[in-house]
Amino acid sequence: MDIKSALSRIVGQLDLTTEEMRDVMRQIMTGQCTEAQIGAFLMGMRMKSESIDEIVGAVSVMRELADKVELKSLDGVVDIVGTGGDGANIFNVSTASSFVLAAAGCTVAKHGNRAVSGKSGSADLLEAAGIYLNLTPTQVARCIDSLGIGFMFAQSHHSAMKHAAGPRRDLGLRTLFNMLGPLTNPAGVKHQVVGVFAQTLCRPLAEVLQRLGSKHVLVVHSKDGLDEFSLAAPTFVAELKNGEITEYWVEPEDLGMKSQSLHGLAVENPQASLELIRDALGRRKTENGQKAAEMIVLNAGAALYAADHAMTLAQGVELAHDVLHTGLAWEKLQELGAFTAVFKVENEA
């Protein structure tokens, strides 16, 4: 199906099949569509609301066209990632949590990008921390194999996205592509915590990942609007495990945590996020640093559970708490910086 035919269907509020969506996405991602057509398609999809079949089709094409990171094994390899767009401008919780996971012995293939609507994307934070981002897929794999953690800079692995960049920027609205990033990890991880910007997306995206072969995934949105587990409110979870999806609410107290305000956790730029994370993972001398540490523990604990490194969410949180207080997570971040610095010299020689 070509994009003009797809537009006619969408205007009539009719869904595309998975294969039809694959056809259209392939045209978009290979430069066969005009920017006007892409903008109209994205806007039409948003107004109609994307079906599970359509999201599956779009994700499968993005995965096919990605510059993949080949790992020796995907057993237990985990990613913790969010769609962004929650408007809270909280520090980079998922990225900080990734280093707790690695320090706990998990293998982490972290996928992320620069900020679009927020103040600090995962790539912005890591760059501020002195971590070199422009790695080849082979170099990322070496990071993961050697350190237990590597970062896949989305724009380096999804170069075909450039064809949709202009229309997305001009629209200035959340579109289908905001959902695709967390679902298109270039290493092909089967274990994830995926934060989303609306509770209504939790079940559908869990179903998408179920159809695409994921093993253990938590798709989450908190009642106070975050695309991650919150200390200040219950969090809704759609969990895919053993081929089945269950939905439930989690209170911080259910996991041995104390409910508290998120005041003091918003940041204005990547450097501020880094300073808060340094405090949380290291010194914890400030009230906000302690609160940030607890936010990291909550989310890292969920990812330890998704990675099957813990038997329950509560056990994952307990393990994350123990690991964070060793200081090993901050050391792991510094190790990644030193390791990638060698690749920077190689690539710029």
UniProtKB/Swiss-Prot annotation:
Q: In which pathway does it act?
A: Amino-acid biosynthesis; L-tryptophan biosynthesis; L-tryptophan from chorismate: step 2/5
Please verify whether the record's keywords include Protein biosynthesis: no
Q: Which GO terms describe its cellular component?
A: cytosol
The entry's 5-phospho-alpha-D-ribose 1-diphosphate-binding residues are 82, 85-86, 92-95, 110-118, 122
* Pfam families linked to this entry: Glycos_trans_3N (PF02885), Glycos_transf_3 (PF00591)
Key words of the record: Amino-acid biosynthesis, Aromatic amino acid biosynthesis, Glycosyltransferase, Magnesium, Metal-binding, Transferase, Tryptophan biosynthesis
Q: What is this protein called?
A: Anthranilate phosphoribosyltransferase
Which species is the source of this protein? Pseudomonas putida (Arthrobacter siderocapsulatus)
Taxonomic lineage of this organism? Bacteria, Pseudomonadati, Pseudomonadota, Gammaproteobacteria, Pseudomonadales
